[in-house]
């Protein structure tokens, strides 16, 4: 089995796969203060839950947008396995044709999602990632990665609103019943859900206008955000939260020349 990690600023997705399928995914929170040993204990618990013996791990791959944690997780692999993991970045074959000014600026998470999406979906396409940031990756009809739209993520902007306003309360992450809120809580929930859905629809409209054609639109990222926000969008958007792990699987076997 191959152990894969997708490290975001907010959460870390842990997955296991082989040549046939993705066997499991789990999520833990990102904490810059945790030591390699603390993360190793957490990952060992995840493996135990999924009945995976660390001795079964024969390879590894990491995609990270938190460079400061890369060495930490290399040490985690050393603590749990005999594996030296791949790190998604320059020098690793991804299969993604990146056509932007400086490909080195492109986050690893965007690359792995694009690697999977180009194998599964028709181009042109927009890949929406709902995470710490909300991103729109664009691939043209020739499946060239031509650019990204980035803005603050749903939870990031919402937390900033509640922390920096004196009279707005902390509220639960619950769906609103209607757009026009009749209380502070309902109004804020409306903004979080309907506001972000409208923003997503608006960005899709502008991207398609700029390309001059309709796109396949896929959403990935945090499962609860995809499940709560995307249904309020008016565009047809496929939800595929396994996309990053599928991309890590694709890239791993592309670089080991064992993929079927």
Residue ranges and their predicted role:
Residues 111, 166, 193, 234-260:
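Glycine-rich phosphate-binding/hydrolytic loop that grips phosphoryl groups
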Residues 43-59, 203-215:
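Phosphate/pyrophosphate-binding loops at sites that engage ATP/ADP/AMP, CoA/4′-phosphopantetheine
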Residues 2-6, 61, 125-129, 218:
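Short glycine-aspartate micro-motif
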Residues 2-45, 142-167:
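Short glycine-rich, Thr/Ser-proximal phosphate-binding strand/loop in the N-terminal lobe
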Residues 10, 133, 225:
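Conserved Rossmann-like nucleotide-cofactor binding loop
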Residues 26, 176-216, 236-238:
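Adenine-nucleotide phosphate-binding core of ATP-dependent small-molecule kinases
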């Amino acid at each position: 089995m191959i152990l894969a990690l997708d490290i975001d600023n907010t959460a870390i997705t842990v997955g296991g796969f082989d040549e046939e399928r993705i066997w499991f995914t789990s999520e833990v929170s990102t904490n810059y203060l945790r030591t390699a040993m603390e993360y190793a204990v957490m990952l060992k618990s995840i493996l135990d839950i999924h009945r995976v013996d660390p001795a079964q791990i024969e390879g590894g791959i990491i995609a990270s947008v938190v460079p400061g944690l890369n060495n930490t997780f290399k040490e985690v692999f050393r603590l749990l396995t005999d594996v030296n993991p791949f790190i998604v970045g320059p020098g690793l074959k991804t299969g993604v044709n990146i056509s932007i000014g400086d490909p080195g600026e492109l986050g690893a998470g965007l690359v792995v999602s694009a690697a999977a999406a180009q194998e599964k979906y028709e181009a042109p396409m927009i890949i929406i990632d709902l995470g710490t940031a909300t991103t729109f990756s664009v691939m043209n009809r020739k499946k060239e990665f031509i650019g990204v739209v980035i803005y603050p993520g749903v939870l990031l902007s919402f937390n900033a609103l509640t922390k920096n306003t004196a009279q707005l309360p902390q509220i639960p992450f619950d769906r609103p019943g209607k757009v026009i809120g009749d209380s502070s809580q309902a109004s804020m929930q409306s903004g979080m859900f309907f506001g972000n859905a409208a923003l997503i629809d608006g960005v899709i409209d502008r991207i398609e206008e700029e390309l001059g054609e309709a796109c396949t639109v896929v959403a990935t990222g945090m499962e609860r955000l995809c499940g709560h926000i995307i249904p309020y969008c008016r565009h047809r958007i496929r939800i595929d939260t396994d996309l990053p792990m599928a991309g890590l699987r694709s890239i791993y076997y592309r670089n080991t020349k064992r993929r079927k």
